[in-house]
Regions:
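FIC/Doc superfamily catalytic core
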Residues: 1-300
Length: 300
């Protein structure tokens, strides 16, 4: 039976030979990332646009949204789309919130609870199945988390925990801790589960906000990194790793950080390969053309 167990929010100081040190060291270059390569810029940005749609679809899929890619693309291509279904609006809200973050949050800016609540309000706005009766307001009752043995804290303690979280991310720790703080803050938010619904979508938006806050150049190349891509690839692993961190042990929290930051590193490597025209032609475009040709032959 799910149960609540308090544990303090604090930094990790991994051993020098920890995998966490390795992944943090490799990711530090993201602060000064400048994309370049042999892929023509228009082609690269078109591909990134496609990935943005896939990432929004992936974020919604984690929450159980089963909209197909074809339906989502069709809704985006319509000049004057008909009234969006609840599931399509859910993804449109995510994209709108991502743009809001990029326009209204700058490196070094302090995070506020008001900003977090604003993200939540945008995420659930106009939704029925995955909406919230009180957009932007902390929950007033108990909630349970799907596939989790962790029971979030009582509603009366949510403001205290969220105030603590905001203070933690804004505290001027040495920059070497920034990436670790991004991962820890993601888990802590999920652990608190401050809203009645939409917590998963909101925390992934918060993670993107924190990367910008700490000066990581995630907006380069048309949003080079969206944390959603990390978590939507394997929903079961996402919940399993959250479960490890829920225990509050140093080992569990460190394993969570390695999972999150390792996923970011993998996504950056994928983007880097897209800037290589030879890789793009040989491994993506040519294979896609071959599959399309085979389908055409089969249809005949």
């Amino acid at each position: 039976m799910p149960a609540f167990h308090h544990h303090d929010l604090g930094l990790l100081n991994p051993a020098f030979d920890s995998p966490l040190v390795d992944v943090v060291t490799e990711l530090e270059y993201l602060r000064r990332l400048q994309l370049g390569g042999s892929t023509p810029a228009p082609v690269f940005f078109q591909l990134k646009h496609i990935f943005h749609m896939l990432e929004s679809l992936g974020s919604a899929r984690i929450e159980g949204n089963h909209t197909t890619l074809a339906d989502y693309v069709e809704s985006r291509l319509e000049v004057q789309p008909a009234r969006l279904s609840d599931q399509l609006r859910e993804m449109a809200n995510i994209e709108l919130a991502m743009s809001f973050i990029e326009e209204h949050f700058a490196p070094g800016q302090d995070l506020t609870e008001h900003f977090i609540r604003e993200l939540h309000a945008m995420t659930v706005q106009g939704l029925e199945r995955e909406g919230d009766d009180n957009p932007g307001a902390y929950r007033q009752g108990l909630v349970k988390i799907s596939q989790s043995e962790h029971l979030p804290p009582e509603a009366v303690t949510v403001p205290q925990y969220m105030g603590e979280l905001v203070q933690f991310v804004n505290h001027p720790h040495p920059a070497k801790y920034d990436l670790i703080k991004v991962a820890l803050a993601h888990h802590r938010f999920a652990w608190v589960h401050p809203f009645g619904n939409g917590n998963g979508r909101c925390v992934r938006l918060l993670t993107y906000t924190l990367l910008i806050k700490y000066g990581f150049n995630v907006k380069a190349g048309g949003r080079v990194l969206n944390p959603t891509a990390i978590f939507c690839n394997d929903r079961d692993q996402y919940y399993a790793m959250l479960g490890k961190a829920d225990a509050g042990t140093l080992e569990g929290r460190e394993a969570w950080c390695v999972y999150v930051l390792g996923g970011m590193l993998d996504e950056l490597r994928k983007v880097d390969r897209l800037t290589d025209a030879n890789y793009l032609i040989e491994r993506i475009l040519s294979e896609h053309a071959a599959v399309s040709q085979a389908l055409d032959v089969t249809a005949l």
